[in-house]
A protein has these predicted regions:
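Core nucleic-acid recognition elements
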Residues: 1-183
Length: 183
């Protein structure tokens, strides 16, 4: 199956998160180089048919009254810089999990695989130093990373099965000399 992708952005005046990010970035940069910020949620879905995807993007992934829905990422203007942020593999993505569960309930079919990312369209006269500060402000390296803007062939992730840990027999019975030798 192929990967379906859509982009969802809050319309003005509902884009309160984008306004908050703009304020945070102005404080972090200690300058007025940021003129505007747009926050766009990106959804990648797999194991879903096109009809169900079309239904989901209009009823689950977006709210037509307050959201603008795009099939392709909006093109950045000349003075706009785009930063995409996604959760690290293994980190729980509540937005994606909630979307997946809702789609399964709505379609009464197999649960689709969903990945989400957040795209920040930052408009202004930004230096490379500003961009690095913005990355440090918007990306918590413990849980997230910079995401690719390219559409993947698949969103399914395979992980190697880790080796079993070594079993230490008699460890609990070691005295101080035994613990020192074990070190």
């Amino acid at each position: 199956m192929s990967v379906y992708r859509c982009f969802v952005e809050k319309k003005q005046p509902f884009a309160t998160e984008a306004n908050g990010v703009k304020s945070d970035l102005k404080i972090a940069l200690l300058n007025d180089n940021v003129n505007n910020v747009r926050v766009i949620n990106r959804y990648d879905l797999e194991n879903i048919d096109e009809e169900d995807f079309k239904m989901a993007e209009r009823t689950i992934l977006s709210e037509p009254q307050v959201d603008a829905l795009y099939e392709q990422a909006p093109v950045a203007e000349d003075d706009e810089w785009v930063l995409a942020v996604e959760y690290l593999p293994g980190q729980f993505d509540q937005r994606a999990d909630s979307a997946s569960q809702c789609i399964q309930l709505a379609t009464m079919k197999e649960k689709p695989e969903v990945r989400s990312a957040r795209l920040y369209y930052i408009k202004g006269n930004l230096t490379e130093e500003d961009k690095e500060k913005i990355k440090k402000t918007l990306i918590n390296p413990v849980e997230a990373r910079e995401a690719s803007l390219e559409k993947p062939e698949t969103i399914h992730q395979n992980y190697e099965k880790p080796a079993l840990p070594e079993i230490l027999n008699g460890f609990i019975d070691l005295d101080e000399a035994g613990l020192e030798a074990f070190r």
